[in-house]
Every structure is written in C-alpha cells, then in structure tokens.
Amino acid sequence: MVQTLDEIKLSGLTYASDSQPGIYRKGKPGNFHYETKDGERVKDKEKLARIKALVIPPAWTEVWIANRKSAYLQVTGIDAAGRKQYRYHPDWTSRRSESKYFRLLEFGKVLPTARKRIAKDLRRDDLDERKVLAICMQVMLKTLIRVGTGAYRELYGSHGLTTLRNKHVKIEGSKLRLKFIGKKGVKQDVTFNDKTLAKLVKSCMEIPGQDLFQYYTEGNEHRPIDSGKLNNYIKEITDCDFSAKDFRTWGGTLEALRQLAICNVEAPETATAKKKVIVKVLDCVASKLGNTRAVCKSSYVYPVLLEAFENDQLNKYMKKINIKPAVSITALENDEKVLMAFLKAVKNNKITIKKAASKKALAKKSA
C-alpha cells in the first residue's frame, strides 16, 4: 500500500477509498439523486456535473462516489453480475498504463507476505470464514481458475472458484480434480496433487449443503463465501487494492515466461519462428487459465514480456528458469524471482521496447 500511496502522491492526485465518507447514489434508474453520508441531498451544480460526467452505469448498485474530483478512485459500485467495479481518475489510469511495470511488480513484492498470511489462516482450528477463504485462495494459487459469481451461475449456469459445488470435485488420496462449466460455457477440468489441500477441501465438502466453500459462523450456521468476500480477503492479505485477477495475471505471465524458456531450447532465430513460439506459448497459458489465446494475450500476459522475447532481450532471464515442471515451492519461487528481476529491469529502463508496439499492446490490455 505504501508504494501505491507514493505513486498517487507523485501523480498529483489524492487517495480515496469507499470505506471513507463519500457521495451515495439513491433512487432508481431515470430518477436518481445523490446524498452525503449524513443523508443530505447533493444540490451543488458543479458536483452534479462531475457526477454526470462520470457516466456511472444505471444498473450499478451500492454506488459510492469520491467527494473530491482529485481523488484517484472516483467511483465504486456493484454491477448486474454481482461484481465490484471501480472507476479511476483519467490521470491515474493514464499513469498506470504508462508505468508498465507498476502493478505486476508491486504484486510480486507483496506475494510472499500474502502466502505467509494464507498459510497462517490455514492452520486455524475451526472452519470459520477466514480459514475457508484461505483454503479457497490456496486452490486459486494451484489452479488460477476464475473466482466466479452467483449471478453468472444463476444467469448462465457457469461456475468459478467461489461458486463450485461438491459435485464438481473428486478427491482420491492426494489427487484433487475440479470439473465444471466455466465462463462462456468453456469446460474446465483441472487436476493437481496436494495431500494437505485435498484434506482441507474434503473437510469443506463435509459441511451440509451443495456449495463447496462454506464456513461456520460463531452461531454454528453454515454460509457460503462469495467473490466479494474473497476479493476483500485478498486486499487484506496484500495490504493493497489487488484482486483475484491480479493472481491470474501474475500466474499467466509467469507461465508465459516458463513456456518461452521451454520453447527457447529450440533457439528460434527468425521473426516468423519467434511469432510461432509466441502462439504456442499463449496456447499453453490459455489452457492453464481456461481462456482463449486472444484473451490471454490481451489481459493475462504482460505484453512487454513477449516483445522482449521477440527483441532478444529475454535470453538471460529464460536461462534461469526451471524448464522442468515446478512441483516444489522452491522451484516456483525461483521462477518468480526471475520474473521480478525482469520487471525491475523494465522499471529501470534496462529493457528497451519499441514505443509504438508497447502502446498498442497496453491499449489492448486496458480495454
């Protein structure tokens, strides 16, 4: 969070959070009005003009608007699918795009601490909310599957991590298999081995009800977790405004780096050969994330990584990657350190990228 605050200060903007008092949208579509924390109706023409310019979707609920027009975070709300959405100040969005290394690098810095906090919560005695959220996060770290929302399950019959049901899980000893229909009807079939995690997931399955990830309240009632609870937990364990998507982006970029290292054994030299390698790599990442190649390239793989590969600026990093499956946490951490070294090199301008190509890739990424 410290780095984020520093970046906000450098941008000339001010910090804001929806946990702070703000302006709240009331009423129904076509007849909205706005109130302060104290319930006073907002009548100031300048404030109302700013709110109108934000173009907040009518379908959003629980809308919070920052009091100050200089706030880096301008609006939050819940969309029709039940997902929390954020609208940032244009200057902040622009700065984050220009600081190409910023979000992934900062995420990599807090990841070790987040893992330690998850491990601590996994050792809790009771299957309370915190322990089940930690179990859910551990499954995410293993699989990188989407979080999912109750709205998507009801509307489209698709599932994600937080909406999985017991019928989607099969456990045999230390082997855990997740088989379900994901977003856009894509069939997901993920298997991994982890004796401890399999035991923890099995304990969740023993809680009455169809939902896989449920917890016991202090009153011994069982309730399911949801995407909001999980993303709030992520913000807590990272001390920053990260979400489940950041874990998937980190995992997708790390997998891309690993696959580039594996494919580079063949030492492709021509531009055409390198482009073929990139297609192959993106297919591998897509398989891991349960996405299409196009979505992975635009949203889950850091574009500068692919450009560095094409420009022969990734070789020294690929040589340090374990090209055998990273079955141990030590091997995984080694590869993550290599990725961090690359991101720091980008930050320090030691990796030179063609500006036109970089901007095009980043425009796609933020779309």
Task: Give the residues covered by each predicted segment.
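Acidic, low-complexity interaction regions
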Residues: 262, 271-367
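A positively charged, amphipathic N-terminal helix/segment that binds anionic biomolecules
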Residues: 1-159, 163-250, 254-278, 282-289, ...
